[in-house]
Curated annotation (Swiss-Prot):
Residue numbers annotated as active site: C408
The protein's name in its UniProt record: Uncharacterized RNA methyltransferase SPy_1606/M5005_Spy1319
Protein species of origin: Streptococcus pyogenes serotype M1
The keyword Nucleotide-binding is annotated on this UniProt entry: no
SUPFAM superfamilies recorded: Nucleic acid-binding proteins, S-adenosyl-L-methionine-dependent methyltransferases
Family: Belongs to the class I-like SAM-binding methyltransferase superfamily. RNA M5U methyltransferase family.
MF (Gene Ontology): 4 iron, 4 sulfur cluster binding; metal ion binding; rRNA (uridine-C5-)-methyltransferase activity
Biological process annotations from GO: rRNA base methylation
Chain sites annotated for binding [4Fe-4S] cluster: C73, C79, C82, C162
EC number assigned by the record: 2.1.1.-
Top enzyme class: transferase
Keywords attached to this entry: 4Fe-4S, Iron, Iron-sulfur, Metal-binding, Methyltransferase, S-adenosyl-L-methionine, Transferase
Length: 451
């Protein structure tokens, strides 16, 4: 390797990497530089040298891209929550198209060069879109602060005005830090593994109802805290306590107790409403969720005789879009509270053809097929890790005629398509910008069993 740590070098940025970093070559060495844009001439300092590449930090931009903009966020460079806020928004959408192409080129699923990759669907106003926040709490010189850990560290960056966070949720977390200070509530101590470590605030866009989870390693007295908070913000309908005594970086423990208020808040998507309990998964960008789920509906051609499996179903929100026009919908999720919500939601909407069960998709689908159930179509919306290998084998064994893959990680999507394209043709990939100013995107893939 021709470069060394701390060495300062000039660099011409040739392209953008999948994490939003600029990529250039210095004497044939591949160098990744966060904050740099394609076409720029920069000066940077090497921070790490690996076997096949090096990493560097941006020092100066000698020739700026015409697509560079000044980020409005005061903590953009230290927070790490957003990666491409310095790139003009229309070009962010182009970047996300390219991220999909890069992933496909790396894994090379059958026929990938002919896949139709449709332009990413963006937002008219790509700010204050996050309806959910999960901030860590720490004590700074005796004062409580809330925020996010800086990229790749355990150093908290206090945030009191996040530009991608819904304003009400930001106002509530700001009030929470004041009240935690006021009532001297115990703040998490990493050495002792004790105290309040995380606060989750989620708002339902349709109803303006808010739920809060306090994540703590031990019981905390919150009566006065709850009383003052709910008086200041009547939109708060639920306060729950999640017990997490683990030393790991997992945000939540297994036990969640409603301390105050109702069990769920009311949300709506595609003209139907549903209950959302504190631990149930739901997309964090409600405006774009309408777009995303609308694309899922377009991608499946089903009718009154068809049966659908909605894997990783959460509270049932995707499957409900089909329940009124198909023979049956079955879904599963590993979070029991989400399945309870799905069952209640189906009953409330009169969908007696919808059935939900708690457990792993790879286990439950196999069980259903052994019991004689046959799906004409399957919808998968897995976490960033992609499809479990056992689930992939199950799908390829039973081969439902249609499939829609909703992905939040283009790399694991491309990896899974290597297996799926042995049986299925990819009709198109439609990217939806669920996370403006970040390097992440969501993609809807329409697959049809090959004849």
């Amino acid at each position: 390797m021709v470069v060394k740590v701390k060495q300062k070098i000039p660099l011409k940025i040739k392209r953008m990497g999948i994490n939003g970093e600029g990529i250039g070559f210095y004497q044939k060495t591949l160098v990744f530089v966060p904050g740099a844009l394609k076409g720029e001439d920069i000066f940077c300092q090497i921070t790490a040298v690996k076997r096949n590449f090096a990493e560097a930090k941006l020092l100066t931009v000698n020739k700026a891209s015409k697509n560079r903009v000044k980020p409005a966020c005061s903590v953009y460079e230290t927070c790490g929550g957003c990666q491409i806020m310095h790139l003009a928004y229309p070009k962010q959408l182009d970047f996300k198209d390219d991220v999909i192409r890069q992933a496909l080129k790396k894994f090379k699923p059958t026929g990938y060069e002919q896949f139709e990759i449709r332009p990413t669907l963006g937002m008219k106003k790509p700010d204050h879109y996050r309806a959910k926040l999960q901030f860590q709490l720490r004590s700074f010189g005796g004062t409580v602060k809330a925020g996010l850990f800086s990229q790749g560290s355990h150093r908290l960056v206090p945030i009191d005005n996040c530009l991608v966070q819904d304003q009400l949720t930001q106002d509530i977390i700001n009030k929470i830090t004041q009240l935690v200070d006021k009532y001297k509530l115990p703040i998490y101590n990493e050495r002792k593994i004790a105290g309040i470590r995380t606060i989750m605030v989620r708002k339902a866009q349709a109803s303006d109802q808010v739920q809060i989870i306090v994540v703590s390693s031990k019981e905390v007295r919150l009566a006065n805290f709850i009383g003052e908070l709910t008086k200041a913000f009547p939109q708060v309908k639920t306060v729950a306590l999640n017990s997490n005594r683990s030393k790991s970086s997992e945000i939540y423990g297994d036990e969640t107790e409603i301390l105050w208020g109702q069990e769920a808040i009311h949300e709506e998507v595609l003209d139907y409403g549903f209950a959302l309990s504190p631990r149930a998964f739901y997309q964090l960008n409600p405006q774009q969720t309408e777009v995303l789920y609308g694309e899922v509906v377009k991608a499946l051609d089903v009718g009154s005789k068809d049966h659908i499996i909605d894997a990783y179903c959460g509270v049932g929100s995707i499957g409900f879009a089909f329940a009124g026009k198909v023979k049956s919908v079955r879904g599963m999720d590993i979070i029991p509270e989400a399945i309870e919500d799905a069952q209640k939601n189906a009953k409330a909407m009169g969908f007696d053809n919808a059935y939900y069960e708690a457990g792993k998709a790879e286990d439950i689908i196999s069980k259903w097929y052994k019991q004689g159930y046959r799906a004409d179509a399957v919808i998968v919306d897995p976490p960033r890790t992609g499809l479990d290998d056992k689930l992939l084998k199950t799908i390829l064994h039973y081969q439902p005629k249609q499939m829609v893959y909703v992905s939040c990680n283009t790399s694991t999507l491309a990896r899974d398509l290597v297996q799926l394209t042995k049986v299925y043709d990819v009709h198109y990939i439609q990217s939806v910008d669920m996370f403006p100013h970040t390097a992440r995107t969501e993609a809807v893939v329409k697959l049809q069993k090959r004849v």
